[in-house]
Structures are given as structure tokens and as C-alpha cells.
């Protein structure tokens, strides 16, 4: 078929500008169109090299405009300027309109030019020999019929139907390629369409969906037949003036078309056609040929596999949590429990597993209620992370003193040690902790039956930084060990004793005299009397006092403590039958910072509630459960008069009617009233909110 339609070898290096025929190369200095600033075309993705583009090779208009035959006649230059295209015809009228227009255009060419061009490039050797014997006119006629049939089938497979007609200055092949598949031409005018037949292999271009940006039919306009970029189809460059050879914009914009794929042929064809028209007329061609080689590097590229992909923005990247800095991820993981980190987060990926093994997560270990925690496991944990500062092994029944000793030996920086209800542990464990962890600040070892005063002595003498101790229900502890701790640990702030029958007033006195920083004191159920409790008036920083179930506690001692300890915010006097209305009235008047008052099972009446509501402006929580003398009057008056009350406990106050409580709940929604029925309602409401539904089948059975 000649070098025009032959494939370009795959191993040949890419050309920097479109290849043209010899006539163009010899006369390129004459083809100079005015230089115009072009907007930088958007880069288009390169298509796979395995696909053969129709537009590769020399420009297809060269053999028409610059045919080596006889000189072109002047009829082509005398064609009137292009006018805005008429409204797009429907269905089969596309082919008729295009055929008539191009028939008039190519009729101006010399018949010899058409014949020579067809014989040289498009016809096979046999067809050329047969056509040589015929007249030039009949040859052009046969050539047009064959081209119309071939390009109609090619255009039908390339583009969607319903796209409006586009006027081009190039050959009819370019027009058919960027137009909807035309209907078969009318039978009346089959011979007027002078089209060329392309038999090049791989001439197909992948179909694309119509784009939203309209294109001009002229190759010189932005977004025109040239498509991708460069002088012919930049899309972003300003429109050319009419004298430059571009089409005029119609009054109504044409239907949107797909942008043509960028290629050397599609970009250089309109410019060469315009230049050819000027040369044929005998005038001086504008200097556009100088700009063509310059833009060939960037514009003459293979089209993408899908030509419309160049107009689509790449999908936004999905944010990934792993893009956050490790410090932020560690802060997030710090809000997870040990189970959530070890059994959930660490199994997501290796990166999260490494983060979950960060040393800061192993500073504070909560191993409570885990029966699988043994001495061997505790030793491995301590060996892996020797910077543990807090550990909780409450209810770990599989541990022994040896495991705690290894932990204390490998974690000398331990600050907080908690071991509730570990009845298997003895003084050995507490002595090991005291010996190897001198910075210890918190020791909670409640309900350890084997703990004695010997362990407390070692703890007090070695750990001078103790601030918080809890020895509740350690029944073998006595004043001997407690006094050693009180005299040695002068920084104590919290102490809690519960049911330690061997602890008496001497221990209370020792703590009051040697530990002035005490803020929380609890001696629930201990053998303490008013003689020892009165020493607590020396504690100016006392904020919470728990004196539950002190059988020999009198009202005067309580009133004196409230008067002296101005920072007292919580007072628990439950299970003290001697506390009466007069004591409660003094507490309400003198407790300037008191917020919580617990009077369960005390000998009080409605007058105590009325006094609280009348005299106190700070008390928020009042619990008078199991007080048999409390009635509807007291509950109603305290709710009406107190401005600070937020909780009122009336559990098992049998003289308080439930209907009265229901009315109070409606009238004072800011107050929580605690009764058996009200607590049940709140519990059910929380269960429903968490998704619980009653099992009606089990209830009926």
C-alpha cells in the first residue's frame, strides 16, 4: 500500500515530529503559518505499544493536497468561507449532507490528481493497473464508492450513534472517523461521495463514551479533530481567527463529542490542508510549519487505550490509618485494654503488632482475674519489659510467692502493686517487693490472710515513698505493723482498713500525728472508738473520711471533725445507730465543702432531710436508705428546698410511697431518686439501650 499505510517497525525509535511525504519535506520552508501561543496541553497517558493506531505515519492529506501530479487548479481556493453548520440532520441524512459537501470540494481538484493519488497510495497493484485503462473521472467515482463503504463500516465500530455532524477541512476519511456511524447513503446519489479506502491493518480505535466538552470540527481549533494536544486539538488554546483557517463557532453549540486520540496525522493534517490551500492559490503560506516540528515532541504521541481517560480525574486515595505518625497510633492504642491490644489490635498486621509491643504499653499491666497467669508467664513478661511501673495481679490464684519475687527482682522501678484476694501469697512476696522496689508508692494487698506485721515492718522501713496503702481484711495485721508504717512513711495520703479487728485507736493516733498529708482515711469495722477518731481533727487536708460501722462513735466527735476539717468533701457514717438529727443539722451547717453524705441505717428522721435542704448549699449526694423514719414529707421537702441536690437514696425507706417518688421524678428530673422500683427501671432502660430484648418464649414456658 505504500509507505503511508505501512506499519512503522516496533524497534524503530519514536520520531520527534510527524512523518510526511517527500513533497512536504522539500517544501516545508514555504509552509509557514503565523505563530500562535498555545496553552500547554494536559499530558496524556501513553498507550500500550502493542496497539496499532490508525493515525501513525505521514499525514493523510499530503497525498491529496500535495500530489506530485499536475498543479492544482485554482478552483479550490475560490470556495466560499465556511459558514456555521446547519442544524444536525437526523438518521440517514448525515451521509447525504457529508457526501454532497465533500463532492463539491473535491470536484475542484484535477481529475488527474485524484487518479494519481489513488493509484499511488490506496489501490493495490492489480487495482491500479485496472484503473489505468479507465478514464480519470470514472476512477475517482469508483474510488469514492469503495471508500464510502469501507469508512462507513469503520466508523460504525468506532463511535456511538447520535453525534452531530462535524465539518473538516481534511479528507472525508477524517470526517467519517470523528462522526457517528452514518446510515447507508441514499440510492439517488451514490456516486457523489469521493472517499478514500484505507486498508491499513489495525486501523481500529477503541470506542469511548461521549465527553462533556464540545469540540470544534476544525483541526485548528482547540479540541478539534486533532484531539489530544498541539496545534490541532489543545482544547485550552484560544480560538483562531477566521483568516487562520479554523471554523466559526455555530450559534448553538453542537452535541458533545468524544475527543479524538492524539496522533501525528490528526494534528498535522488540518494545518497542512490549510497551507496547501494557500500555496495552491499562489499566496505566501503563514508560518505554521515552524511551530509544527516544535510541538511534535509533546503532541504527536500514541493515544491512550481509552481516549476519554485523559479527561477523568484519578480517583482519590483512600486514607490509611497507618499513614499517621507512630506517636499518634500509640496514643490511640493506649485507650485500649490489654485484651483489645493483645487479642484484637495486634492481629491486624505486623506493624500494629510491633506497636502493641511498645514498651510504654507494658509499663502498666492489668492481669487481674486471669487464672492462666502463672509464675512462668509472669517471669517472661518481666524479662521482656523490665520497666514495669504498675501491675495488678488480683484474683490470680495460679501465682505463688516465687513468681512475685522474680517480678520484683526484674522490675526495680515498680511504683504500684495491687494483689487483692491472693490468699496464697504470704509475707515473702511483700518483703521481696519492698526489698527490690524502694520507689514503691502504692500497695493494695487486701484480703490476704497470710500477711502479718512482719511484712508490714519490712515495707515501712524500706519504702519511704509510700502514699497509698490498703490492708483491708488482713486479719493478722495489728497496731505493731501499722505504727511502723505510720512512723516511716511520712508521705502517706491514703489509708484504708476494713474489718481489721486488731487495729485500734493507737494506729489512728499514730497516723494522725506522723502523716499530716493524709487526705483519705478509712477504718471501717475496726476496733476504733471516738477516743482515736478525735485525733483526726489534726489532719487539715482531710477530704474523705470513712467511719462506717464504728460502734463506739458519738455525735460530738463527728461534729468536731466536721468543724475542724474544712476541706472535708465526703463523709460516710453508715451503720452507726447513734447518729441523730442534731448531728446531721450541724454537719449541714458546718460542712462548707461537703458534697457527699452517707447516712444509711442511721437513727434519723424527716427533720434531718429538711435541715440538709435548708442549711446546705453544697451537698449533692444524700443516701438515707434503710432509715425507717423517713417519710414522703422529708423526701418532698429536701427536693423542694435544696438547690444542689443531685442524688437522693431512699432504698428500703418503707414509709416513702412509690407514687410520691414517681411524682418527684417528674417534677425534679435533675435529681436521681433511688428506690427498688426506680433502680429496676433504670437498669431495664440501660439494657434496652444496649440491645437487650426480653425472651418471651422462656417467660411463657
From Swiss-Prot:
Signal peptide span: none
Domain (F-box) ranges: 318-365
Organism: Mus musculus
GO biological process assignments: nervous system development; neural crest cell differentiation; proteasome-mediated ubiquitin-dependent protein catabolic process; protein polyubiquitination; protein quality control for misfolded or incompletely synthesized proteins; protein ubiquitination; regulation of smoothened signaling pathway; SCF-dependent proteasomal ubiquitin-dependent protein catabolic process
Keyword Isomerase (UniProt): no
Name of the protein: F-box/LRR-repeat protein 17
InterPro entries xref list: F-box-like_dom_sf, F-box_dom, F-box_LRR-repeat, Leu-rich_rpt, Leu-rich_rpt_Cys-con_subtyp, LRR_dom_sf
Tree of life domain: Eukaryota
GO-annotated cellular components: cytoplasm; nucleoplasm; nucleus; SCF ubiquitin ligase complex
Similarity field: Belongs to the FBXL17 family.
Cross-referenced Pfam families: F-box-like, LRR_6
Polar residues bias spans: 285-294
Cellular localization per UniProt: Cytoplasm; Nucleus
Predominant subcellular localization, coarse grouping: cytoplasm
Comp. bias (Pro residues): 81-90
Keyword list, A-Z: Cytoplasm, Nucleus, Ubl conjugation pathway
Taxonomic classification: Eukaryota, Metazoa, Chordata, Craniata, Vertebrata
